[in-house]
Amino acid sequence: VSVITSSHLHDKPLRPEDATNITLTKDSLEAEDNNGRFEIMKPPGAWKDFFDRMLSEKGGGKKRKASNFTTPFNGERYRCILADSSGGQVITMRKLMRSIPRVDKDLGLDWNAIRPLLEGSGLTIFAGQMSSGKSTTMISAIEQLGRKRGNLGTVEDPIEVEFQGGGVIQREVGTHVDSFAEAIRDFVRQYRNTIMVGEIRDPETADAAVLAASLGHSVVGTLHADSAIDIPTRMASLLDPKLARILPSVLRGLWWQHVYRRGDGKSKPLPIYESLYVTNSVRQIIADGPEKLPQLMNEMVSQKRVSMAQSATAWVSKNQATREELRQWLETRGRINDSQLDYVR
């Protein structure tokens, strides 16, 4: 491997095979691993051959339209997007999981904080920004529930990992079903106790998820949001107004997380998270409107749940990170502000 540049010149060079995120062109390969290490190199022979093969197999059709696909390579599975650019064709790749990690031992999260958010029926949202690990946490939590979850239906884009042991229907958007919403409606008719939605990203999916939860199913999905308190706002902005009114009654649990990666090749990723169990008092606050949502912080305190600032502070106190590194989570980041209130009025 010919390294052009590295984010950490004294570390052992990062191999493409060890990267979780890759950007590949005919002349360069950008690699980033789960610890945040980043390097740019010339594509090794096997990767150059892969690039040429994907252009031949997937590069047809309209140049301005990206091609999304999942493919095996070098013993791994990758989620790929092939797209045109001013510099030529580009393939962005994300390595998919081989097996399901454990919530506590592998992800470093508190299972006792997550478990109550998944009990019974209703809607539980795992939120965060891009590359925050929210999907991995959701999948790990569902796996750890085991038989308590009942029979399971999952819809993803793509399927991240296969659940083992039977009692599972897994569907991939674009391969087995046309949309997330269609799969959710099918799962309701197929009597799936638990329905896992890879991403709630459009109104149709949000509406279907809330309807399924209102019918007594356990619905679990991911959503882009800046904090646990931000989740009801983001969810309501997607929903039909009639369904937005019943959102407080079907919500069961809110989980938000981010993963800080130092990028030194030695430090483990540090999870920063906060959560809220949706009690009757929480439902009332959400129902009272966006102006009342900051009161959810008090509910978090009364439930003895960790806020994102407390979670970040714990890593600083353990000398795993500095205050400067985690400053954006130690401050009042992602809380309700005027622009968010205007967005949902």
Task: Name these PLM-found stretches.
Residues 1-345:
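Short, flexible helix-loop junctions that flank or precede catalytic/ligand sites
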